[in-house]
Structures are given as C-alpha cells and as structure tokens.
C-alpha cells in the first residue's frame, strides 16, 4: 500500500503535435501553421558565431544550426569571440549578455565600432526577459533578442527575420540603407 499498491491508471496525456491536434484543436491554428509554412533558411554554409559561457547552450545552438547546414564557431567568453570575429567574420552572431570578463553589451559595442564587423547581425541571448536588457541591446545595436530557454522554432524565426532576398543574414539598418540608396530619386519641377 505504501508504494501505490492500489494503482490508478493515469490519464492519457494529450498530444500537442500538429498531427494530433488536427484542424479542430483550440490552439491548433498557430501550432499547425508554423510547421506547415515552409521555413526560409539561410544559404548553406552560412557562418554563425556562438558566444555563450554555457557549454550546454553552445552545444544546443551548434547542433540545431549545423543540422540546417550552418558552419559554426564557438566561444565561451567575449574576448575569444571577438578574436574569432577578427580572424574570420561570421555572417551571424548569437551573443549572450552575461559572460565572464567582458559582458555581451561590451562585446556588442566592440563589434559595432569595428569596421570589419559592424555589418554583422547580432542576436542577443539572455536568461532574463527584462525590458531594460532588450532596450540596451537594441540601443547599442543588437538586431534581435532571444530569451533562454529557446526552441528550435524560435532560433530559425529570429534568423528568418534577418534574411535578405538572397537568403543572407543582414542587419535591419543595412537593408533599409541599401534600399534607400538604390531607390531612384524623383524630382518634380518647381512651379
């Protein structure tokens, strides 16, 4: 009796997979839609740099990105990450805010001040969802913000937001500036 001699059969867990939900599920519209809509991936061989002091987070991001054809490099601190960027600039950076030594904000400032890396899109990562962190990350020049823990879907949704028409990650300001520079200037005669 102490170990549950009179067993009760536990209720069947409800499945939340898109196939199990079908079209009738209460939240199925969002769940099914995101999986049916084809994901827009960056080009094969896109280089991503992961800077995070958690080996678990680094391993998870590396696995997800490599499974989609990305080439990854990893650093457990900002200083090493900046060195890797100098050696071979990536197409995209995932940058944790809380790091030993230089924090993510300091690293982001260094990335934006360096002419050889200032064009690289940066997705900041943090275990905190405080609006102040997001505000400072955006103000310093982050292109997006991702809260830990994150899903595979969120990783690719953040990347997709940064892809240009050639499926290359670009800074939001770069694409806006590029399209403004390419737009024809229309002048009308002054009466």
Per-segment meaning from a language model:
Residues 59-67:
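Charged docking surfaces used in two-component/phosphorelay signaling
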Residues 62, 106, 129-144, 157:
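Alpha4 helix (beta4-alpha4-beta5 surface) of REC/receiver domains from two-component response regulators
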Residues 69-76, 84:
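Short hydrophobic/Thr-rich beta-strand motif most characteristic of the beta2 strand and flanking loop
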Residues 100-103, 118, 130:
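The feature encodes the CheY-like receiver
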């Amino acid at each position: 009796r102490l170990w549950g001699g009179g067993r009760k059969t536990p209720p069947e867990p409800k499945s939340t997979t898109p196939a199990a939900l079908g079209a009738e599920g209460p939240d199925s519209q969002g769940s099914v839609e995101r999986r049916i809509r084809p994901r827009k991936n960056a080009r094969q061989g896109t280089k991503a740099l992961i800077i995070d002091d958690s080996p678990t987070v680094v391993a998870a991001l590396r696995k997800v990105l490599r499974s989609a054809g990305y080439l990854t490099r990893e650093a457990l601190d900002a200083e090493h990450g900046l060195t890797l960027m100098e050696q071979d600039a990536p197409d995209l950076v995932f940058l944790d805010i809380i790091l030993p030594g230089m924090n993510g904000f300091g690293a982001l400032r260094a990335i934006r001040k360096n002419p050889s890396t200032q064009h690289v899109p940066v997705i900041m990562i943090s275990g905190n969802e405080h609006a102040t962190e997001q505000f400072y990350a955006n103000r310093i020049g982050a292109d997006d913000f991702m809260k830990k823990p994150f899903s595979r879907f969120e990783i690719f949704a953040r990347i997709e937001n940064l892809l240009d028409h050639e499926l290359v990650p670009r800074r939001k300001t770069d694409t806006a500036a590029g399209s403004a520079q390419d737009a024809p200037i229309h002048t009308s005669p002054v009466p």
